[in-house]
Amino acid sequence: MTEGTAGGRNMAAELLLLGVLATLWGASYTFIKLGVATIPPVTLIAARTLIAGSLLVLVLRGRGMTLPRGRAVWLRFLFQACLNSVVPFTLIAWAERSVDAGLATILNSTSPIFTFLLTAVFVRHEAVTARKLFGVVAGMLGICLIVGVEALGGFGRELVSQLAIVAATICYAGAAIFGRSFKGLDPIMPAAGSLLCGTAILVPASLLLDRPWLLAPSTASLLAL
């Protein structure tokens, strides 16, 4: 096998994985929309975060890895949890009670643009080029075409909810930048650690605010978890 052939196959595999990731990420908004139909936003996100965190802990154990125990790193996990799960997940779930899943996907696709802007302001050592700006704008336009530009028809009718999704997107951008501080760790560790911290915040909030034992969620909402 030539080096060029191997490189082409690697690129194809990476593009396939990227496509799968984009599909799963986009579908998550549909699942959230189904979930909040009968489950309050905080409880829905608490359950999803608990499930995701538990799965990652199992993966860690399966790989023979353990989470770090230092106080400093867990404070960083906690901060990352607020940026990457607690605040944005809850905002999106709350907003999707009135915003269509397609429009939520499009609004969230602005995350690379906010990452670009925040990087330009706070991470001065990275070059900001027209090529990068073109890339993120082209990516957002591509998502609009995939989801369907008709989803933009609801833009402006539920402004507060839509702004909540944009705020969540800015949180994701901040999380992407802050996540670079975990370079010394295996990527699964900050993911698992931050989800566990998010669970520790969201589950008590759910118990206090929603009293989930009194809820009667639909089968569709439960499956959306």
Language-model features, listed with the residues they occupy:
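Loop-to-transmembrane-helix transition segments
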Residues: 13-23, 58-61, 65-93, 108, ...
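Alpha-helical transmembrane segments of compact multi-pass small-molecule transporters, enriched
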Residues: 16, 28, 51-55, 107-122, ...
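Juxtamembrane helix-loop-helix junctions in multi-pass membrane proteins
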Residues: 23-54, 94, 100-102, 174-198
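Membrane-interface helix termini and inter-helical loops of multi-pass transporters
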Residues: 30-39, 94-98, 145-160, 206-225
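Specific alpha-helical transmembrane segments that line the substrate/conduction pathway
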Residues: 43-54, 83-84, 89-130, 168
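Hydrophobic transmembrane alpha-helices of multi-pass small-molecule transport proteins
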Residues: 56, 78, 117-118, 128-150, ...
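Transmembrane alpha-helical segments that form core, pore/gating elements
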Residues: 56, 115-117, 153-212
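Loop-to-transmembrane alpha-helix entry segments
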Residues: 68-72, 76, 105-108, 124-145, ...
